[in-house]
Swiss-Prot record:
Similarity comment text for this entry: Belongs to the GPAT/DAPAT family.
Cellular compartment(s): Cell inner membrane
UniProt organism field: Salmonella arizonae (strain ATCC BAA-731 / CDC346-86 / RSK2980)
CC annotations in GO: plasma membrane
Transmembrane segments: none
GO BP: any one term: fatty acid metabolic process
Alphabetized InterPro entries for the sequence: GPAT/DHAPAT, GPAT/DHAPAT_C, GPAT/DHAPAT_LPLAT, GPAT_PlsB, Plipid/glycerol_acylTrfase
EC number: 2.3.1.15
Catalysed transformations (reactions): sn-glycerol 3-phosphate + an acyl-CoA = a 1-acyl-sn-glycero-3-phosphate + CoA
Gene Ontology terms for molecular function: glycerol-3-phosphate O-acyltransferase activity
HAMAP family in the cross-refs: Glyc3P_acyltrans
SUPFAM superfamilies: Glycerol-3-phosphate (1)-acyltransferase
Record pathway: Phospholipid metabolism; CDP-diacylglycerol biosynthesis; CDP-diacylglycerol from sn-glycerol 3-phosphate: step 1/3
Protein's name according to its UniProt entry: Glycerol-3-phosphate acyltransferase
Length: 806
C-alpha cells in the first residue's frame, strides 16, 4: 500500500485510535477458530467502511493475524486481503465498486483452479458499533445496517467504546473450488451466502426490535386466551368487564420487562468497572456453541443454576461481551423493590410470583407474555431451581416455567426453541453467611434497599467467576425422540396440557440438571475447602494439602467428570497461594513448615463451596471409602457396592452416568487411583497402599457424610418397615441433627429437609418403600449392613441408640 491510500488510512486512524476501544469475539480468534497463520488468510466484511477495516486491523495486529491492509501475493497476482460484500458511501472513487466483491471472490477461486496446493482461508468478520435494536414502530429491521459518513462519525464518537469485532469460523476456498467449481456463478453464490451470514449475525448480536410497551399490552389483551380469562375474572369476582380488564393490565405492568439498550450500556460500564475491582477474572467456556445457535436462528432459553443474586448481572454481562443479546430474565417478585425493580426491568427482567395457584388470570397473563417473548424471538433466561441454592448443591427443579415453555411450542411457533444449561461458579458468594443462618432455622430476610446496600458494602475480593455453557437441548429434537405424537397437541389458542406433558417436563428438567452439573467448574476455593473439610481437625500441612489437591486434579484431568467440565490449569501450589489470598483460611508457621487451617467459624460457610463440586468427586470418594473400610476388596464386590448405592447418589447429585456405564467408570477411576499409588491391584483385588493411606482417607471423606445420612434412613426403615414417608423424613432429620451435634458435623445440608425428601422419594422409586409405607425389611437391612461397614463404629452406635431410645 502506498501513496494516497496510506496517507488516508493514517489520517483516519488518528481519531479512531482515541475513540474506539473494541473487543475481539472470540477472545483468541486464531486459537479458538483454528486459523492457520502459515496459510493465506483473507477477510470478508459486510459493507464498505474504512473505519470498520481499521478497527479490524487493530484487532488483527493485537492477535498476530495478518494485516488486512497488506495485499496477498499468490502466483504473481496481487489481491486485496479484504473484501466488502456491499458497497457504500465512499470518499475516493477508486474504492470497491458495487460488484467488486463478486469479482474478487472469482479471482480468488480462479487461482485455486490453477494451483492445487493453494488453500486460502476466508474469514467473515463483523465490526459493530453499538447494538441498539430500535423500536418496532416505523422502519423494518434492515438485514445490514449501512451508515453514511456522517452517521458513522456520530456512531463511532458515541459508541466507539461499545464495539466489537466478531471473527467467524473460516471457510476453505480450496474446498469451495473442489466441491462447487470456480466460475462466476459460484462467486455470486458465495457473496450471497456471506450477505445472509452477516444479516443473521447482526440479528444474533442486536436481537429483534423492541415493541412499545402499550402496543405489547394491547396485543396481549386482544389474545383469545386473555380475553376469556378476563371474562372469567369478571364473572367469578362479580365485577365489571372494564374492572377485570384493568386487573389484567395491572398484572402485565407487574410482570413485563421494559428493556432499554441505554440502560444496558450504562450498566455494562458500571459492571465492567466493578468486576475488574472485585473479580480477578471471569472464566467463560463453550460460548461458541451458543453463538452458533443464535446465528442459526434458534429461540434460546438460558437455564443456569442459581447461586446468588449476582447471577442475573453476571450472565447478562458475559452474554453481552460474547456478542449476544442479553436475555429477558424471569426474576422473583421479591426483587421488585425500589430502586432495584425498575433497574432490573430495564435490563430485561420480567417478574414472576412464587406461586400461580388460585389465580387463573395471573397464570394466563404470564403464560401469554412468555409465549409472546418466544414468538417475537427474544432470548429468555430462567432459573429452573426456582430459587438460590442455600447448600451449594443443585436444588430439585421447579417445572412451572419449563412447562409453559413447552406449551409455547404447542402454539405452533416456527422458531426452534433450544434450552442451554449453564453452570455458574464463584470463589466467593456474598450471601453464603445468610444461607447458613437460614439452614439453621433463621427467617429469610425480605429483599430491600437497606439489605442490598449492606450486601454491597461487604463486597471485597471475590476471586474468580466461572460461566460454563453446557450441552444445549433442542426441544423439538427431544420431543421428536420421546413424544413422537407431540404435534397432535398443537393449538394456537388454548394452553394445552396433554397427558404426556407432566412426565416429559419432569424428564427434561432432570436432564437439564444433569447437563448443568456436567459443566461444573473446579477452582482453587472449592478444591481447598474439599480437602480441609475432609480433615478431622480442618487443618493440613502445606505438603499434605498440596498432595491432596494433586490427587483431586489428576483424577479430574485424567478421568474427566464430563467433556464440558473444567479443571484449573494451575498447579496445586499455585491454587493454594490463590486460595490463601481470599482470606478464608489461616496459615501458621512452625519449625517444620506451614499449616493451613480452616477456622471453626468459617467451616460451616466453606461447605457451600465444597458442595459446588461434590458431584465431580463423589464417585472416586465412594470407591475410596469402600476400599478404605474393607482394606482389600474384589473388583466385583466393589462394583456391587457402588451399584447398590448409586441410585440414591444419582438422584441427590444429578450424576450423569446410567447404571450400565458404571463398570467402565469404576475401571477408569481404579486405574487412575492405582497410577497415583493410592491402591494396588493384586489378583483382581484392590488393596490399600499404606504409603498413601492418608491421601486415600481424605479422598474417602468426601463421601463420609452422605453415607452417614443414608445409614440413618435405612436404619429407621429397617427398624420400622411400616413407617410412612413423611415420618421417615422427619425422624431422619431428627437423628441427623443429633448426629451433627454429637460428632461435630459442620455441614448444614446434613439435615436439610430437601435432601431427605429427595432421598425418600428415591427409595420409593427404587422399591425400598411403597406409597403406603410398607418396606421390604430384608432388602433395607442388607443395604444398612453395607452402609454400617462404611461408617465409623461410634457413628453407627449413635444412629442405632437414637432410635432405640425412642
Amino acid at each position: 500500500m502506498s501513496g494516497w491510500p496510506r496517507i488516508y488510512y493514517k489520517l483516519l486512524n488518528l481519531p479512531l485510535s482515541i475513540l474506539v476501544k473494541s473487543k475481539s469475539i472470540p477472545a483468541e480468534p486464531a486459537q479458538e477458530l483454528g486459523l492457520d497463520t502459515s496459510r493465506p488468510i483473507m477477510y470478508v466484511l459486510p459493507y464498505n467502511s474504512k473505519a470498520d477495516l481499521l478497527t479490524l486491523r487493530a484487532q488483527c495486529l493485537a492477535h498476530d493475524l495478518p494485516d488486512p491492509l497488506e495485499p496477498l501475493e499468490i502466483d504473481g497476482a496481487l489481491l486485496p486481503r479484504y473484501v466488502f460484500i456491499h458497497g457504500g458511501p465512499r470518499v475516493f472513487t477508486y474504492y470497491t465498486p458495487k460488484e467488486e466483491s463478486v469479482k474478487l471472490f472469482h479471482d480468488y477461486l480462479d487461482l485455486h483452479r490453477g494451483n492445487p496446493a493453494l488453500d486460502v482461508q476466508m474469514v467473515p468478520v463483523s465490526v459493530m458499533f453499538g447494538r441498539a435494536p430500535g423500536r418496532e414502530k416505523g422502519e423494518v429491521n434492515p438485514p445490514l445496517r449501512m451508515l453514511n459518513g456522517v452517521q458513522k462519525f456520530f456512531a463511532i464518537s458515541w459508541l466507539g467504546r461499545d464495539s466489537f469485532v466478531r471473527f467467524s469460523p473460516s471457510v476453505s476456498l480450496r474446498r469451495m473450488a473442489d466441491e462447487h467449481g470456480t466460475d462466476k456463478i459460484i462467486a455470486q453464490k458465495l457473496a450471497r451466502v456471506a450477505r445472509m451470514h452477516f444479516a443473521r449475525q447482526r440479528l444474533a448480536a442486536v436481537g429483534p426490535r423492541l415493541p412499545a410497551r402499550q402496543d405489547l399490552f394491547n396485543k396481549l389483551l386482544a389474545s383469545k386466551a386473555i380475553a376469556r380469562a378476563v371474562e372469567d375474572e369478571a364473572r367469578s369476582k362479580k365485577i365489571s368487564h372494564e374492572k377485570a380488564q384493568q386487573n389484567a393490565i395491572a398484572l402485565m405492568e407487574e410482570i413485563a420487562a421494559n428493556f432499554s439498550y441505554e440502560m444496558i450500556r450504562l450498566t455494562d460500564r458500571i459492571l465492567g468497572f466493578t468486576w475488574n475491582r472485585l473479580y480477578q477474572g471471569i472464566n467463560v467456556h463453550n460460548a461458541e456453541r451458543v453463538r452458533q445457535l443464535a446465528h442459526d436462528g434458534h429461540e434460546i432459553v438460558y437455564v443456569p443454576c442459581h447461586r446468588s443474586h449476582m447471577d442475573y448481572l453476571l450472565l447478562s454481562y458475559v452474554l453481552y461481551h460474547q456478542g449476544l443479546v442479553p436475555p429477558h430474565i424471569a426474576a422473583g417478585i421479591n426483587l421488585n423493590f425500589w430502586p432495584a425493580g425498575p433497574i432490573f426491568r430495564r435490563l430485561g427482567a420480567f417478574f414472576i410470583r412464587r406461586t400461580f395457584k388460585g389465580n387463573k388470570l395471573y397464570s394466563t397473563v404470564f403464560r401469554e407474555y412468555l409465549g409472546e417473548l418466544f414468538s417475537r424471538g427474544y432470548s429468555v433466561e430462567y432459573f429452573v431451581e426456582g430459587g438460590r441454592s442455600r447448600t451449594g448443591r443443585l436444588l430439585d427443579p421447579k417445572t412451572g416455567t419449563l412447562s409453559m415453555t413447552i406449551q409455547a411450542m404447542l402454539r405452533g411457533g416456527t422458531r426452534p426453541i433450544t434450552l442451554v444449561p449453564i453452570y455458574i461458579g464463584y470463589e466467593h458468594v456474598m450471601e453464603v453467611g445468610t444461607y447458613a443462618k437460614e439452614l439453621r432455622g433463621a427467617t429469610k430476610e425480605k429483599e430491600s434497599l437497606p439489605q442490598m446496600l449492606r450486601g454491597l458494602s461487604k463486597l471485597r475480593n471475590l476471586g474468580q467467576g466461572y460461566v460454563n455453557f453446557g450441552e444445549p437441548m433442542p426441544l423439538m429434537t427431544y420431543l421428536n425422540q420421546h413424544v413422537p405424537e407431540w404435534r397432535e397437541s398443537i393449538d394456537p389458542i388454548e394452553a394445552i396440557r396433554p397427558a404426556w406433558l407432566t412426565p416429559t417436563v419432569n424428564s427434561i428438567a432432570a436432564d437439564l440438571m444433569v447437563r448443568i452439573n456436567n459443566a461444573g467448574a473446579a477452582n482453587a476455593m472449592n478444591l481447598c475447602c474439599t480437602a480441609l473439610l475432609a480433615s478431622r481437625q480442618r487443618s493440613l500441612t502445606r505438603e499434605q494439602l498440596t498432595e491432596q489437591l494433586d490427587c483431586y486434579l489428576d483424577l479430574m484431568r485424567n478421568v474427566p467428570y464430563s467433556t464440558d467440565s473444567t479443571v484449573p490449569a494451575a498447579s496445586a501450589g499455585e491454587l493454594i497461594d490463590h486460595a490463601l489470598q481470599m482470606n478464608k483460611f489461616e496459615a501458621e508457621k512452625d519449625t517444620i513448615g506451614d499449616i493451613i487451617i480452616l477456622p471453626r467459624e468459617q467451616a460451616v460457610l466453606m461447605t457451600y463451596y465444597r458442595n459446588n463440586i461434590a458431584h465431580m468427586l463423589i464417585m472416586p470418594s465412594l470407591m475410596a471409602a469402600i476400599i478404605t473400610q474393607h482394606r482389600r476388596i474384589s473388583r466385583d464386590a466393589l462394583q456391587q457396592h457402588v451399584e447398590a448405592l448409586y441410585p440414591m447418589l444419582k438422584a441427590e447429585l444429578f450424576l450423569r452416568w446410567e447404571r450400565e456405564e458404571l463398570a467402565s467408570v469404576i475401571d477408569a477411576l481404579a486405574s487412575e487411583m492405582q497410577r497415583q499409588g493410592l491402591i494396588t491391584l493384586q489378583d483382581n483385588e484392590l488393596h490399600i497402599n499404606p504409603a498413601h493411606s492418608r491421601t486415600l482417607q481424605l479422598l474417602a471423606a468426601g463421601a463420609r457424610e452422605t453415607l452417614q445420612r443414608y445409614a440413618i434412613t435405612f436404619w429407621l426403615l429397617s427398624a420400622n418397615p411400616s413407617i410412612n414417608r413423611s415420618t421417615l423424613e422427619k425422624e431422619s432429620r431428627t437423628v441427623a441433627q443429633r448426629l451433627s451435634v454429637l460428632h461435630g458435623i459442620n455441614a448444614p445440608e446434613f439435615f436439610d429437609k430437601a435432601v431427605f425428601s429427595s432421598l425418600v422419594l428415591t427409595l420409593r422409586d427404587e422399591g425400598y418403600i411403597s406409597d403406603t409405607g410398607d418396606a421390604e425389611p430384608a432388602e433395607t437391612m442388607k443395604i444398612y449392613q453395607m452402609l454400617a461397614d462404611l461408617i465409623t463404629s461410634d457413628v453407627r452406635l449413635t444412629i442405632e441408640s437414637a432410635t432405640q431410645g425412642e
